[in-house]
Every structure is written in C-alpha cells, then in structure tokens.
C-alpha cells in the first residue's frame, strides 16, 4: 500500500501524494537555542528523522529543513545571565545540540537555517502582509490581523468566536484587536535589533518559520511537523501568515507527536522533573534512548522512567545479540555450510517479514509495530542459528534484513562501546580458556571469563564453539 499519514489538518489518515513525484519537502520546527534541549524535545527530533529515513528508503529525495531560533526573549535573558552576547549563547547551544543529537544517530538536515541569518526574508514577508492589508504597524511593532484571515483556527479546530470568548486578554493599546499577534517587536533599550522599514527591532516567533519554509522549500510544502504543543498558536499562526501572503496552501500534511511524560506526569520546571537530553545521555546509551522513543507510536504519549528504559535496553539487546550471532557465524565460515533443504522456505519467510515491516511503516510510520516485526525477525534468526545445517545464503539474507530494518529506524546493531581488548586479543584469551578447560584447570578458565566480563565482553558457549559479544 502507499504511505498513509495522519493529517492533523483533516484529522484523518490520508495517502501521501507528493507535490512532485519522487520528492518530499519537509519542514520541522527546531529548538530555541538558549539552553540544552530537554528530553521531550528529543522525541520529535527522533520521530521525524525516522520519517525522513523511511521516505528515503522508499526512494524519495527528501529536502529536510529544521530551523534554529537564535534570537528571542529567552536568548536575551540567557545572554544577560551568562554575561555573553546573544550570538555567543546561540553558538554555544547550537554546538551542544549537534553534539547531543549526533549521539542519537540523527541525520543532518538538508539545511538548518538560523533566524538571524535570514532577516531580509523575514522583513520582506512582513512587508508583503502589510501591503496586502493583513498586518499593520503600531508604535514600532507590527501585528497580524487575525480576524481578516477567514480560515484561522482550521488546524487546531477552533472558531474565532471561541478564541475571542476564551482569550486571556492582556490589554495592549498597540493592538487593534486582542487576537492579533506580533510579527515584529520594536527594539528595547540595550537589546539586540535589526533595521527594518517598520523601525529597529526583531521578529516575532511565528513569522520566522513561515519565512524560512518559504525560502528553502517554496510557497507550498509537503509536510510540516513538530510537537503537539505547537499546533496552537505557533502552527496556526504560520498557516495564517503564509497563506495570507502567498494565497496558496502552506502545507499539505501536518504531523504532530504526542508529549513525553516523566513517571506519568508532563515534564515541567514547576514539578521539578525537567530533564535535559544532555543529562540523560550522560547515564544512558543513546541507542537505547532512540529505541525507547520509537517503541510507542508517535501520536501516543510516552512515559520515561528507569523501568521502561531498562525494558528498552533489554529489547534492543535482543536484536543486537541476534545480529551479532549471525554476523559471527558468517565471519567464521569454515566451508562446512551446506545447501539447506528448506532454504527457499526460509527465504520466503524473510520476504514476508520485510513486507510486514513496510506495512507497519506505511501505516502512519508505526514504529512500535515495526519494532515488533523486527523482534520476530530476530526470533526466527535465533531458531535458524540453532539448526545443525544452515545455508550461507539464508544467513546473509537475515543479516541484510536486520541491517535494513536498523537503518530505517536509525538503530545501531554493532556494539559501539569501547574496551581495551581488540578481537585478536579476545580470541587468544578464548583459546587459552578452552585449553584450560581441556586440562581441567577450571579455576583458570573461570578467571579468564571474569577478565573478559570486566572488559564488557560476554562469552557464549554453543555447539559451534565459543562466541563472544561486547555487551
């Protein structure tokens, strides 16, 4: 079947139809770089990286844009607290961002535009909105006329009348209407600013993404994505600005991931459960964090705690062990492999598992089901490895398919931890242990096993001999 996407705009699953055959234009809202990103921010980063990977696997050329908001009130406050300039704060935490997400095996975006490097495009978009009557200047600020855009609220499912009735009104004499939102903020004393036709100042948050998406992807894009907290007002305002300026549909598909909770509670500074990704990665394998994030469908809330992370670690380890055992069996081929009688049946099973994996991912990128299929693949690999005679063709197909699934999900099946022993040294110790056991020197054999265990190397005694893996 074709790829099906749950579209927040229509509240339905829809078959994906790109603007241009073989190409996907995708924009994902990036972080405001005033601090390390929190662990909840990592969910959309991992989820939409996986969406991108699957499109690539399906043969699409994906143009993937994710921005950095490198000037706003939070950055200005952070600069004052750290006694740095706003650009220095942004540079520090953009660097930290890449350090962290690189560990999560997140592919580089086609472009990561900074707001401050695209100010001309932002100012031009605001000017267009003023010219078309959708925006107005007021004492150095510029505001968007929300009620003039008749489709306002279509993404979040809210009516303008409901917004008016439920608005938390903070009186602002510069606004013509309480629902109008800021496109440009007049400069305050001692704050960073840019020159513009409206006066010195800096952009509001929402206009940035509209301008950047337009510059790097065009007036209409295939997919716009982010966390569900961005549906309103951020993405709603983006639609209003972009479609008012161009007269065209801004994005055909809107994708939003659900929240990450800490022990069942939404993460917040007030609850004292606010955790940065940077801190989580100090104590946890990034491969496990990625596996954990993909173990639940992206539109369902996900809970983080020690027990769930341990489950994720064990689940990932089962896949890694199966992969490493197959690889070891192939690498130690002694020429005794035979043409196994049921080779075609096993290859057919693998074809069916590949189709099941694709069906899972085609169904709104259901990584939870895809991981279940991955575990079924590992289970069958273990069954096959236990056979007395095996086919090298089947083994290689198992290995190839595990690599394929892992690549789509962005998981690493090879052990990435380092130790002080290389493979030849490990093999030498295994040989010494075997000799000790043959000589009934069990104390020395156990000592060697303990030495290897301290080096994070686990031995497995099988009918084919002793194997090792790095745990």
UniProtKB/Swiss-Prot annotation:
Question: Protein name, please?
Answer: Cysteine--tRNA ligase
Query: What is the protein's major site of localization?
Result: cytoplasm
* Keywords, comma-separated and alphabetical: Aminoacyl-tRNA synthetase, ATP-binding, Cytoplasm, Ligase, Metal-binding, Nucleotide-binding, Protein biosynthesis, Zinc
Q: Which reaction does it catalyse?
A: tRNA(Cys) + L-cysteine + ATP = L-cysteinyl-tRNA(Cys) + AMP + diphosphate
Q: Which Pfam families match?
A: DALR_2, tRNA-synt_1e
Q: Which GO terms describe its cellular component?
A: cytosol
What family is this protein classified in? Belongs to the class-I aminoacyl-tRNA synthetase family.
Q: Which cofactor does it need?
A: Zn(2+)
């Amino acid at each position: 079947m074709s790829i099906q996407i749950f579209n927040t705009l229509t509240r339905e699953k829809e078959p994906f139809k790109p603007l241009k055959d073989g190409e996907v234009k995708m924009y994902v809202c990036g972080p405001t770089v005033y601090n390390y990103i929190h662990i909840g921010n990592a969910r959309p980063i991992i989820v939409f990286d996986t969406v991108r990977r699957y499109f690539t696997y399906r043969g699409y050329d994906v143009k993937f844009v994710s921005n950095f908001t490198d000037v706003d009130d939070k950055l200005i406050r952070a600069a004052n607290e750290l006694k740095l300039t706003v650009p220095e704060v942004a540079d520090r935490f953009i660097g930290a961002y890449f350090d962290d997400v690189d560990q999560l095996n997140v592919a580089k975006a086609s472009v990561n535009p900074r707001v401050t490097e695209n100010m001309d495009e932002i100012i031009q978009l605001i000017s267009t909105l003023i010219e078309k009557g959708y925006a107005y200047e007021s004492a150095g600020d510029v505001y968007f006329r929300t009620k003039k855009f008749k489709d306002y609220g279509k993404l979040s499912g809210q009516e303008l009348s409901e917004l008016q009735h439920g608005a938390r009104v903070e009186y602002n004499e510069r606004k013509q209407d309480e629902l109008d939102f800021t496109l440009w903020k007049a400069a305050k004393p001692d704050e960073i600013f840019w020159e513009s036709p409206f006066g010195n100042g800096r952009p509001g948050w929402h206009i940035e993404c509209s301008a950047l998406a337009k510059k790097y992807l065009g007036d209409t894009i295939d997919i716009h994505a982010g966390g569900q907290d961005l549906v309103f007002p951020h993405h709603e305002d983006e639609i209003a600005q972009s479609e008012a300026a161009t007269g065209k549909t801004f994005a055909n598909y809107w994708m939003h991931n659900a929240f990450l909770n800490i022990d069942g509670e939404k993460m917040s500074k007030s609850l004292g459960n606010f955790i940065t990704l940077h801190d989580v990665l100090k104590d946890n394998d990034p491969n496990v964090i990625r596996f954990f994030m993909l173990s639940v469908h992206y539109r369902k809330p996900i809970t983080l705690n020690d027990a769930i992370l341990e489950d994720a670690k064990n689940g990932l380890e089962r896949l890694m062990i199966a992969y490493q055992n197959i690889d070891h069996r192939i690498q130690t081929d002694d020429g005794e492999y035979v043409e196994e009688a049921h080779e075609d049946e096993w290859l057919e099973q693998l074809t069916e598992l590949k189709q099941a994996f694709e069906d899972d991912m085609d169904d709104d990128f259901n990584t939870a089901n895809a991981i279940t299929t991955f575990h079924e693949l590992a289970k069958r690999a273990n069954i096959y490895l236990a056979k007395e005679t095996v086919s090298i063709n089947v083994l290689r197909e198992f290995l190839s398919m595990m690599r394929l699934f892992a690549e789509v999900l962005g998981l690493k099946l090879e052990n990435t931890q380092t130790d002080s022993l290389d493979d030849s040294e490990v093999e030498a110790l295994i040989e010494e242990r075997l000799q000790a056991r043959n000589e009934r020197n069990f104390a020395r054999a156990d000592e060697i096993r303990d030495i290897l265990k301290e080096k994070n190397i686990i031995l497995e005694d099988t009918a084919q001999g002793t194997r090792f893996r790095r745990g």
